[in-house]
């Protein structure tokens, strides 16, 4: 793909596009139109997502109002309770949550939420941002349905600066108000198929949604551009295997697009011999990495291929928190590609993820490697990757997908 078109796509999509919103739909339509311009005909596959309109979100600590954003889908109501800062996850610390509104560090995942409920917490406060950054941005977060399992307590998100100030001042009592209208909305995957000589399928995935503060250039319009570039390359060629490009919606909300795709196409998943995923490439710093949820032979092959074509790649056997994982969980070997930026050189899920993080030459280099790998897999007489998931990866899939708690 020409550099000017790559840069134009980044410019045209430089806005927030949370899963299930009209902005996400707008980008889906844009991707479909770009596909048409390349000679392909993409289709929408819609799926249902939880949505909420926050009408009111207020937080007071010892009478002082703290700027906050209410958690989507946590319910509505008003609380007054003692504040408790959960600085440790050990049993004694958790036992002190009973009857309290609990301030927690880090992300509110499934197991932490279950611990809060089991120990009698009545509400929660999370925080994000960085005390060293000038902004006071607050991310919009949600209590995901697979986390709550229908058991909801009120929650808000605040800026890290306020969290530190609250703990430093030994905050005692909290009043929390959240009012919202919860409903079902629509997100969509954008799917383009390029028929091959056989009915074996290789899937290509990249998500196009962003988080609530982010333009999502690095995470993950870069991956979307990668897929568009590869579609441009393979359209009109004679390909041994069928190619299916899937721009996934609502990845940032829990891999919802790729999960929906696998659920809707259960009967034909056995035809998919390999999944290739792109999530965050082309940044200025760092090097190309491939995360393979597959046999070690694929890991070694990618390392050798990097030497062969002169584009270094660091390949590892691991689970990737991206749209490759639902496919791997269905027994499909996957290779996910990213360029991991060193600490302090690029950041995601905030307002700093813009086109400024991207270097077009690195985009083209990363895409060239992924395309070279894909072409070999597409046209191999027999797909060289065993269609199996090793036991050690199955164990990690169980942990990642919350079927088993990590020890």
Language model: regions and residue ranges:
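Alpha-helical metal-binding/catalytic segments enriched in His/Glu/Asp
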Residues: 35-36, 106-107, 117, 200-255, ...
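Metal-dependent peptidase/peptidase-like ectodomains
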Residues: 199, 248-347
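Second-shell loop/turn segments in exported
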Residues: 14-22, 103-107, 151-153, 178-179, ...
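Soluble metallo-hydrolase cores and metallopeptidase-like ectodomains found primarily
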Residues: 64-67, 71-85, 89-91, 139-217, ...
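His/Asp/Glu-rich mid-to-C-terminal helical/loop segments that flank catalytic regions of hydrolases
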Residues: 232, 344-407
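Noncatalytic luminal/extracellular "stalk/propeptide" segments of secretory-pathway proteins
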Residues: 3, 7-98
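Acidic, glycine-rich active-site loops and adjacent beta-strand->loop/helix elements
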Residues: 107-108, 130-131, 180, 208-210, ...
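N-terminal capping segment at the start of a domain
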Residues: 1-23, 38, 132-145, 209, ...
